[in-house]
């Protein structure tokens, strides 16, 4: 099985076989990322397709520093963010900072009764604006400042959306598991 560097070289040389191999190796994982940011399967497939087009167009810029999968993931996340921005005609709202936030520091707890797939399904049911901030903060590891710049909201709005997402998740997880637990700290 060819290593990733040889596959990248083949893709850069225009090899359809290597492009297909790259796609087949990584499409499932990247599709899961797309599902985190999309409203439905069709939108996730669109993001995946657009993301792979950008991956192939930008392979020349990959510097073989760090994880190639991480590099592709960033492209797919950015593609999802672009789609979100264009779909929602986002503009900055700063006065949301005046709204008091709910408790933003829930504790992490054990979710032994909850499968990862079930948790992802619960996250996917969040309202889109909350899901977007939750994914970027809790899953991708971006700061509120970075999130605010990515999706054109204030840092306060990012914090508020994360807090509200956590409250919703906490309620849904407790309903799902029958136990009152707090959701993912940060």
PLM ranges: what are they?
Residues 60-64, 74-94, 164:
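Arg/Lys-rich amphipathic alpha helix in sigma70-family domain 2
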Residues 12-13, 49-67, 87-88:
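Sigma70-family region 2
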Residues 1, 82, 90-116, 143:
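Internal acidic/polar
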Residues 23-41, 58, 123, 175:
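Amphipathic, Lys/Arg- and hydrophobic-enriched alpha-helical face
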Residues 32, 46-53, 66-78:
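Structural recognition of an alpha-helix C-terminal capping motif at a helix-to-coil junction
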Residues 121-124, 128-132, 140-157:
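Helix-turn-helix DNA-binding module
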Residues 8-32:
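A short, charge-rich alpha-helical start-of-domain segment used by transcription regulators
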Residues 10, 91, 149-152, 166-186:
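C-terminal edge and immediately downstream basic/flexible tail or linker adjoining helix-turn-helix-like DNA-binding
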């Amino acid at each position: 099985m060819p290593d990733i560097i040889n596959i990248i070289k083949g893709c850069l040389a225009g090899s359809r076989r290597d492009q297909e191999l790259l796609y087949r190796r990584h499409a499932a994982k990247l599709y899961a990322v797309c599902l985190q940011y999309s409203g439905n399967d069709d939108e996730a497939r669109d993001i995946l397709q657009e993301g792979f087009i950008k991956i192939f167009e930008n392979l020349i810029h990959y510097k073989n520093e760090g994880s190639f999968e991480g590099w592709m993931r960033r492209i797919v996340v950015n593609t999802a963010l672009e789609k979100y921005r264009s779909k929602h005609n986002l503009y900055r709202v700063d006065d949301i900072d005046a709204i008091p936030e709910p408790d933003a520091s829930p504790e992490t707890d054990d979710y032994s009764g909850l499968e990862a797939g079930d948790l992802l399904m619960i996250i996917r049911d969040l309202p889109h604006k909350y899901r977007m901030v939750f994914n970027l903060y809790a899953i991708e590891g971006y700061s509120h400042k970075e999130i605010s710049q990515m999706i054109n909201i204030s840092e306060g709005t990012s914090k508020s959306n994360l807090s509200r997402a956590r409250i919703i998740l906490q309620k849904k997880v407790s309903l799902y598991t029958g136990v009152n637990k707090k959701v993912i700290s940060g």
